Amino acid sequence: MEKVLMKTEGILRAEEVAPPEEYCEKVCLYSIRYQSDDCEVEGYVGFPLLHNGPWPGLIFNRGGNREFGFLRPEIICKYAQFGYAVFGSQYRGNQGGTGQEEFGGADVNDVIHLIDIALKVPCVRKEGIYMVGHSRGGMMTYRACAIDKRIRAAGIHAGLADAFIMYDRFHDGEYDMRQDMQDLIGGSPEEMPEEYARRSAVCWADKILVPLIICQGTNDWRVIPEQAYKMDKALSEAGKEHKLIIYEGADHSLKGTTYIADVLAWFDEHPL
């Protein structure tokens, strides 16, 4: 598969790496470097070993920003083990990549270009692709779902849907998200309201092109449940196909819930 990946237009480097031990017999994992605009971006690709191809492709969009919350092999393998060819990006400027991430600005192209690449890999089905985003990756997913019809269905894990709420509410004595958002977006909501609206899917839910499932925990203090409720309301008012699942007591990680099974069931309901 390394040679196959290297022959794929847009991939600059592909190296097989060892997956986490629990996935050694289930997933073949690769570290990749790919072209996105004028940037070279780092990422991972995972292929299932126990399922025959061609496989449906899945783009996983990581959370965090810069080196915080960087993409780890475990999440690629978690989805790949179920029969998906999973592609994930660190976004530009991170983990050795070039350029500068913009927290939902031009770096959304890193997701779109990864779709281009995934659909060119011979063992990946060509009819469309699935997408999943966690936290900040939810914002990236919403943005992609408003511009790319190749996405068949998407799942949002504790996803950022309102950048104004995120700016106002995600800060405590140890960590202040406001400075990160100012650094990456270029200013505060008061200084750059258009840029914050651009990163807030609640402001343009009518533009969403893709059936969505939104998974949210009630005890999430990073991306508070209000964001999911607002997005659910906005999608309903826009007449968009979607489903909201609330996990009582779950935090930002959604650990201990059925969120992965729920997302995969949603994909099964929307076959390629």
Task: Enumerate the language-model features and the residues they cover.
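Short substrate-entry loop that stabilizes the transition state in hydrolases
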Residues: 51-55, 60-99, 164
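Alpha/beta-hydrolase fold nucleophile elbow
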Residues: 124-135
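Hydrolase active-site cap/lid region
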Residues: 142-192
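Alpha/beta-hydrolase active-site loop
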Residues: 102-122
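Short beta-strand/loop motif that positions the catalytic acidic residue
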Residues: 208, 214-216, 220
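C-terminal catalytic histidine-bearing segment of alpha/beta-hydrolase fold enzymes
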Residues: 229-272
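N-terminal cap/lid segment of alpha/beta-hydrolase-fold proteins
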Residues: 8-51
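Acidic catalytic loop of the alpha/beta-hydrolase fold
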Residues: 219-223, 253
